[in-house]
Amino acid sequence: MRKGQKFFFVELTDTFGGEANYSWVKRYKVTASSFNGAIRKVAKDTYYRFRKEYDTGDMVKYKAIGACVCAFVEEYNELCHADYSRVIEL
């Protein structure tokens, strides 16, 4: 990991009526220097283009353009996120 970079946790899921549905979910542990850098890496892996919907300070929600998909990006916390299975590392 390069200087200035940290881990981010990204949850990618489907939407129904504009809200996250979680009928399927892909989870990522991403090394990046910002929330935007983390979603760029996920976009490159999934071929979705994302637009920021809102930012709460510790979590950012992105919506995929032209698809019923959203992504939640937050800083990786070992206590909260280590128990998830099948997390893709980018």
Regions found by a protein language model. Give the residues of each.
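A short, exposed loop/beta-hairpin motif centered on an aromatic-Gly-Thr core
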Residues: 21-37
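A short, charged, amphipathic alpha-helix used as a generic interaction element across diverse proteins
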Residues: 33-57
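Intrinsically disordered, low-complexity segments enriched in small/polar residues
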Residues: 2, 15-16, 30, 35, ...
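Intrinsically disordered, low-complexity Ser/Thr/Pro-rich tracts
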Residues: 28-31, 41-43, 62, 73
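Short aromatic-glycine-(Arg/Gly/Cys) micro-motifs in beta-strand/loop hairpins
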Residues: 2-25
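N-terminal cationic leader/targeting segments used for protein routing and processing
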Residues: 4-7, 27-30, 62-64, 78
